[in-house]
């Protein structure tokens, strides 16, 4: 017995989704044109995404795994990157924060649709220093700083009014200088694996994988699409 409002596998809606296709012909990714250092390759592609005015080029999917071995994903914003790793900021008490506390390994993915490119990054995660978190928090707009106090991220709340009331309370309490909440700060993922994907015609996509064999020493390999 089918639930009303749910489409069966043979429904017209399902068929139309199955027929959606795109031919990727914008660019290619060869070993000779790619950097030996994956961080340089990432920097080049990110800058090209910014230059191409890709919407939210800094948005990345973060995948974590909890103690129950169930994976979960969400979109966060990259806030910095260098030879130490990829940085983002969040509520440490959120679902992702709790999962990273128990299992400090994660995966990131950037998908720049307009450029037909994907970057996947895997590695170990650690908190950034308090000084780094303090500096970034102080640079945020006032409303965002108050929001970090107002939102008990990932907790069940009775309605949006809870957030509005909390924002008003903390806004009055801190006026113009809210300090960083102790439950809020940055994470840094130290990559040990990168993959760069460039869409190609006939589904024969380019995939270059970088594996860290020893600290700072990368092996670049081509993967079958």
Curated annotation (Swiss-Prot):
Top-level taxonomic group: Bacteria
Pathway assignment: Cofactor metabolism; pyridoxal 5'-phosphate salvage; pyridoxal 5'-phosphate from pyridoxamine 5'-phosphate: step 1/1; Cofactor metabolism; pyridoxal 5'-phosphate salvage; pyridoxal 5'-phosphate from pyridoxine 5'-phosphate: step 1/1
Residues annotated to bind substrate: 21-24, 79, 136, 140, 144, 203-205
Alphabetical list of InterPro entries matching this protein: Pyridox_Oxase, Pyridox_Oxase_CS, Pyridox_Oxase_N, Pyridoxamine_oxidase_dimer_C, Split_barrel_FMN-bd
Molecular function via GO: FMN binding; pyridoxamine phosphate oxidase activity
Keyword tags: Flavoprotein, FMN, Oxidoreductase, Pyridoxine biosynthesis
Pfam families documented for this protein: PNP_phzG_C (PF10590), PNPOx_N (PF01243)
GO biological process: pyridoxine biosynthetic process
Main EC class the enzyme belongs to: oxidoreductase
Residues engaged in binding FMN: 74-79, 89-90, 95-96, 153-154, 197, 207
Cofactor binding mode and count: Binds 1 FMN per subunit.
Catalytic activity: pyridoxamine 5'-phosphate + O2 + H2O = pyridoxal 5'-phosphate + H2O2 + NH4(+); pyridoxine 5'-phosphate + O2 = pyridoxal 5'-phosphate + H2O2
EC numbers on record: 1.4.3.5
Known cofactor(s): FMN
Quaternary structure (record): Homodimer.
Annotated HAMAP family: PdxH
Function: Catalyzes the oxidation of either pyridoxine 5'-phosphate (PNP) or pyridoxamine 5'-phosphate (PMP) into pyridoxal 5'-phosphate (PLP).
PANTHER family, sorted: PYRIDOXINE-5'-PHOSPHATE OXIDASE, PYRIDOXINE-5-PHOSPHATE OXIDASE
Family label: Belongs to the pyridoxamine 5'-phosphate oxidase family.
Protein's name according to its UniProt entry: Pyridoxine/pyridoxamine 5'-phosphate oxidase
Organism annotation: Paracidovorax citrulli (strain AAC00-1) (Acidovorax citrulli)
Gene: pdxH
């Amino acid at each position: 017995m089918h639930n009303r409002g749910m489409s069966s596998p043979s429904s017209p809606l399902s068929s139309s989704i199955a027929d959606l296709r795109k031919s990727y012909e914008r660019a290619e990714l060869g070993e000779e044109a790619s950097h030996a250092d994956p961080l340089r390759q990432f920097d080049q592609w990110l800058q090209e995404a910014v230059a191409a005015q890709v919407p939210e080029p800094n948005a990345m999917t973060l995948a974590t795994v909890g103690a129950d071995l169930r994976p979960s994903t969400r979109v966060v914003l990259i806030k910095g990157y260098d030879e130490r790793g990829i940085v983002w900021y969040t509520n440490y008490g959120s679902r992702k924060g709790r999962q990273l506390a128990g299992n400090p390994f994660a995966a990131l993915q950037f998908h720049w649709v307009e450029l037909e490119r994907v970057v996947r990054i895997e590695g170990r995660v650690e908190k950034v220093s308090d000084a780094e978190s303090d500096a970034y928090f102080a640079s945020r707009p006032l409303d965002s700083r108050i929001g970090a106090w107002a939102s008990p991220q990932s907790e069940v709340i009775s309605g949006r009014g809870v957030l509005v009331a909390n924002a008003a309370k903390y806004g009055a309490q801190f006026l113009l200088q809210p300090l960083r909440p102790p439950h809020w700060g940055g994470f840094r993922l130290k990559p040990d694996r990168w993959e760069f994907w460039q869409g190609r015609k006939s589904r024969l996509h380019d995939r270059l994988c970088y594996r860290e064999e020893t600290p700072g020493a990368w092996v670049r390999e081509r993967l079958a699409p």
